């Protein structure tokens, strides 16, 4: 029980083991595979450090690639499986998908961001990312951009529909905890799915690496959701207004989980937003949410032992410490449930329902009944407080879980280890709402 609680709800304690540079390497790895696929073997060789280029000739790269495609068929795409630092080197494991199967590759980079190794990896039994059927790459393009807020420069991905002008654009905001730009949880990448699904229907998006992922060292003292989320979200909205071809009057923001909870606050800070989308967004105090989640996970575990109940009671008692609304004599950087007291005070004094009531922008609230992290109790609060407002639309999906994928049951954390895609029905509904159809 304790391990599950920390995994899901300590939110910001996880320290990033790599810096901003590792995300630049994702783009380089993509480009490397594109060159191989386009038979630009000489260009592919330039990705390697000069000290190893003589050992990795264009002819050898051609032979390797032709052997692989002869066995697995034409190349389709490559997705990041994992990345880490090893001393002065960075490694990126990519899962390359071909028409007849997949093959993991390890790309080793030095500090100069040059390849010093390119290896075939053994296939893992773990699930890998599932490219959704609606992700038709002939309909959209992607490129690297940067979200800049004060001194921070975060790697981002701009996804735009091909051949379109005056298109709407959506800023995608993560949930709690350190997160990459895809919102990766196990083999699932909900923000990447959303970007692909929206772009295939003519709507652009910006998604970016969360600051707590790449600048974890800045989050050791006192901070709030301002530093964690809202500053960068507002900066991403400003960036959206500069994108060529984007309709500056059709800028939206989609917040997932904590991002959805904070979406009304962000909208108040960014009046240029046409509307906001709250996906699986808490409406209650986080302490109430965490208590409900832990009770659910305890019941789902079917633990009937006395020790299990004692442990649950201890966790619930500990969670009560997160209800503080003032610091009093407490220092802002005092740690409560793995987060500074300043964080809890700020979040507990924020009322997303009342903030949303003051907005004139359009609001879409979506909730899945198979979500065990943010439940229908939250949606019912949104519905009670906002359903009578003309600028608000609310939708419930009987099958969708917290990662916005269709599931046959509510499930537990183990569900997140299985590859699934964001519901196409949900994406189509978002598209229809944005386009006003």
Predicted regions and their residues:
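N-terminal cap/lid segment of alpha/beta-hydrolase-fold proteins
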Residues: 125-165
């Amino acid at each position: 029980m304790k391990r599950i609680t920390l995994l899901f709800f300590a939110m910001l304690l996880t320290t990033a083991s790599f810096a901003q540079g590792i995300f630049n390497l994702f783009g380089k790895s993509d480009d490397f595979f594109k060159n191989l696929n386009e038979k630009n073997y000489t260009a592919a060789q330039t990705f390697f450090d000069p000290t190893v280029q003589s050992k990795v000739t264009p002819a050898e790269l051609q032979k390797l690639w032709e052997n692989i495609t002869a066995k697995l068929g034409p190349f389709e795409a490559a997705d990041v499986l994992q990345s880490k630092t090893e001393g002065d080197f960075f490694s990126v494991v990519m899962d390359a998908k071909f028409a007849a199967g997949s093959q993991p590759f390890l790309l080793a980079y030095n500090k100069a961001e040059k390849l010093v190794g390119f290896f075939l990896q053994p296939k893992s039994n773990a699930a890998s990312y599932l490219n959704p059927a609606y992700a038709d790459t002939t309909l959209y393009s992607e490129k690297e951009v940067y979200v800049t807020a004060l001194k921070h420069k975060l790697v981002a991905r701009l996804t735009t529909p091909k051949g379109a002008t005056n298109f709407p654009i959506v800023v995608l905001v993560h949930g709690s905890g350190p997160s990459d730009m895809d919102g990766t949880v196990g083999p699932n990448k909900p923000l990447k799915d959303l970007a692909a699904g929206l772009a295939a229907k003519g709507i652009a998006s910006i998604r970016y690496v969360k600051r707590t992922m790449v600048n974890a060292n800045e989050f050791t003292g006192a901070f709030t959701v301002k530093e964690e989320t809202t500053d960068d979200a507002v900066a991403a909205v400003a960036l959206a207004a500069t994108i060529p071809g984007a309709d500056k009057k059709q800028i939206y923001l989609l917040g997932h989980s904590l991002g959805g909870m904070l979406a009304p606050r962000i909208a108040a800070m960014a009046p240029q937003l046409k509307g906001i989308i709250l996906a699986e967004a808490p409406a209650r105090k986080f302490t109430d949410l965490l208590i409900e989640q832990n009770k659910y996970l305890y019941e789902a575990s079917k633990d009937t032992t006395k020790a299990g109940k004692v442990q649950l009671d201890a966790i619930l008692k500990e969670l009560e410490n997160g209800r503080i609304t003032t610091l009093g004599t407490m220092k802002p950087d005092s740690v409560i449930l793995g987060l500074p007291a300043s964080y809890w005070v700020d979040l507990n004094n924020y009322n997303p329902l009342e903030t949303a009531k003051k907005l004139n922008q359009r609001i879409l609230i979506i909730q899945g009944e198979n979500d065990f992290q943010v439940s229908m109790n939250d949606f019912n609060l949104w519905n009670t407080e906002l359903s009578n407002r003309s600028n608000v639309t609310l939708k419930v999906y009987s099958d969708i879980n917290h990662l916005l994928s269709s599931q046959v049951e509510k499930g537990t954390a183990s569900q997140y280890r299985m590859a699934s895609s964001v519901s196409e029905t949900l994406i189509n509904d978002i598209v229809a709402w944005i386009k006003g159809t």
